[in-house]
Amino acid sequence: MRELNDVYDVVVVGAGPGGSMASYASAKNGAKTLLIEKSQEIGEPVRCAEAIPSIEEFGLKPEPEFVRNIIKGGILFSPSGKKVTVTQDKAQGYVVERKIFDKYLAIRAAKAGAKVAVKTTAIGLERDGDYWNVIVEFLGEEYVIKTKVVIAADGVESNIAEYAGLKAKKKPLEICSCAEYEMTNVELLDKNMMEFYFGNEVAPGGYVWIFPKGETANVGLGVRDKKKKAIEYLEEFIENGLAKDRLKDATPIEFKVGGAPVSGPIEKTYTDGLLVVGDAAGQISPLTGGGIYLAMDCGLIAGEVASKAIKLNDWSEETLKEYERRWKEKHYEYLMSHLKYRKILEKMSDDELDALAEALGESLDGIDLKKFVKRIITKKPSLLKYFKDLL
């Protein structure tokens, strides 16, 4: 492949939303950029529930090509079935077709000037003076790609950051195991509302979701548990869970599995000539497991910082630390607060989760975690022990 026999300013490893946005920003700002993806097709395999709160700020329009549904809120269910409806006046987000959306973002990067190499796996990384040698495998052959800056957007199983000496590996229980069916004939409560089901029996350390997707719906869950596999919990929910009557005629048309790192961001996301983005960097909500938007925004910042470093002819750690400063200014507080809330929810019994739902009430306008906490403590003082440090 001719793209592998060249020298680049920036090589991005991983063509998920974060990697494609990094490639787009890098190429748009004049850096000679290569985006490599280990799969033979960008967007495959799909590994997530496919919800994203916003795309307009990235200069994207919600094209019918990839948007499957507009989301206006969510319905939360406690273990016993107590319901809390969260709504907003304006559209809260979208459910996208990831296999199309990811490809759309990669095409956008290519149109900005980035080269793309698929079925190309990064198997090593070596320092070569001021450059990196990215060792890749394509169709059984090894290639060495020389580059000034590497952007590691290679997902939860990231090796690139580790090759560069950054600590990115996650322990098993720091990863939420996910399983999901895309199903048809699902009876929805509301075609524009996502559904979430909580409980230590139904999804320990996580939750079940039902996301409307036009003619179909994503029915899945994430768990942090050693007792059973995620798919076993999912099958039990479909057969015996709170939504069983609405799922009795549902049938799967696609099955997806994956993992979401929910332990918060890694300690350091930059070093000489290298930046880490998205799931690889732990830039994903520890509470919801949502990471598409965060990966895109952090990827955009990484691409801008990398291309700026090329123009300065200085891609040292000192120059690249701007990336971590910028993404932390926007997202670090959000991530760490979600980590605190996740740890609180994990300590609660099912009875306490029911009490929590009762305290929140049947409906909420918008999501404001601080207001949630005040309402909870006022209505259910017994839960103060969990939330007192957040006041």
From Swiss-Prot:
Cofactor list: FAD
SUPFAM superfamilies noted in UniProt: FAD/NAD(P)-binding domain (SSF51905)
Keywords assigned: FAD, Flavoprotein, Lipid biosynthesis, Lipid metabolism, Oxidoreductase, Phospholipid biosynthesis, Phospholipid metabolism
Annotated residues for binding of FAD: G18, E37, C48, A49, A51, R98, A122, D279, G291, I292
Gene Ontology cellular-component annotations: membrane
EC number: 1.3.-.-
Pathway in which this enzyme or protein is active: Membrane lipid metabolism; glycerophospholipid metabolism
Cofactor note text: Binds 1 FAD per subunit.
BP GO annotations: glycerophospholipid biosynthetic process; membrane lipid biosynthetic process
InterPro entries assigned: DGGGPL_reductase, FAD/NAD-bd_sf, Geranylgeranyl_Rdtase_fam, Geranylgeranyl_reductase, GGR_cat
GO MF annotation, one: oxidoreductase activity, acting on the CH-CH group of donors, NAD or NADP as acceptor
Catalysed reactions, semicolon-separated: a 2,3-bis-O-phytanyl-sn-glycerol 1-phospholipid + 8 A = a 2,3-bis-O-(geranylgeranyl)-sn-glycerol 1-phospholipid + 8 AH2; 2,3-bis-O-(phytanyl)-sn-glycerol 1-phosphate + 8 A = 2,3-bis-O-(geranylgeranyl)-sn-glycerol 1-phosphate + 8 AH2; CDP-2,3-bis-O-(geranylgeranyl)-sn-glycerol + 8 AH2 = CDP-2,3-bis-O-(phytanyl)-sn-glycerol + 8 A; archaetidylserine + 8 AH2 = 2,3-bis-O-phytanyl-sn-glycero-3-phospho-L-serine + 8 A
Family that this chain belongs to: Belongs to the geranylgeranyl reductase family. DGGGPL reductase subfamily.
Additional facts recorded: Reduction reaction proceeds via syn addition of hydrogen for double bonds.
The protein's role, per its UniProt record: Is involved in the reduction of 2,3-digeranylgeranylglycerophospholipids (unsaturated archaeols) into 2,3-diphytanylglycerophospholipids (saturated archaeols) in the biosynthesis of archaeal membrane lipids. Catalyzes the formation of archaetidic acid (2,3-di-O-phytanyl-sn-glyceryl phosphate) from 2,3-di-O-geranylgeranylglyceryl phosphate (DGGGP) via the hydrogenation of each double bond of the isoprenoid chains.
Name this polypeptide is given: Digeranylgeranylglycerophospholipid reductase
